[in-house]
Amino acid sequence: SNLPVLNIGSGRIGYLVNSLNDIDFNKILKDKNVDNIKKRTPIIQNQDENLPAFNEIVIIKNSPTRILDIEIEVYDQNVKLRADGIIISTSLGSTAYNYSAGGPIVQTSLESIIITPISPFTKFPRSIVVDSSSELKINIPKKQHYSIQFDGVEEYLSDTKSDEKFNYKLSSVSYT
C-alpha cells in the first residue's frame, strides 16, 4: 500500500526524525500526494530466499576471538577482506550503524549501496559507495561462525559444521 511513514524518535539519536511540536498531523492526514516518500528495500538472496532490509544488512562474526574471511565482488572486481564483519547499507541507513563504524553519510536522494567493513584486519578502504543498480556478491568461505542481521534483527545463523560455502547476492535497491 502507499502509506506515508512518519518517523518519531524514541531514543536519543534520530536522523530524519521530527519533533512532535513540528508535526502538522492534519496536513499529513489530508495530504494524498505521497510521491516524495520512497520505499527502499535492498534484498539479499541466498539460493531461492529473498530477505529485505530498510536500513542495512550486517554480516558479523559470532565469536569475539575469531575474524571473518569475506570475499566481495562488485563491478567485476574481487576483494578479500578479513574483519569482524561487514555492513551493507542504503543511503537512508548510512546514518545508523554504517556511520558508527566509520562509514560516510550519504544524501538520501542518492540511490546507492554503502559497503563498510567492521574493524577490518586487512588493508581495505573504509567504505565503498556504489550505485544501487550494482550487483554485489558476497562469499563467506565454509566453516565460519557468523550471523546476518536485517535492520538489527538476526535472521540467519551459520552452521560451523557445514562444508557448504555460503554465497549471497545483493540485488539492486528498489526506489519506487
What feature does the model see in each segment?
Residues 1:
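N-terminal glycine-/serine-/threonine-rich phosphate-binding loop
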Residues 11-85:
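Catalytic core of DAGKc-family lipid kinases
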Residues 38-42, 53-55, 66-70, 84-86, ...:
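A generic structural signal for short beta-strands and their flanking turns/coil linkers
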Residues 80-84, 88-124:
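Gly/Ser/Thr-rich active-site loops/lids in small-molecule metabolic enzymes
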Residues 176:
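Conserved small/polar residues in nucleotide/adenosyl-binding loops
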Residues 135-160:
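A conserved acidic, glycine/proline-rich C-terminal tail/linker
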Residues 9, 57, 152, 168:
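A residue-level signal for conserved active-site and pocket-lining positions in enzyme catalytic cores
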Residues 4-6:
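Proline-centered loop/turn at the N-terminus of a beta-strand
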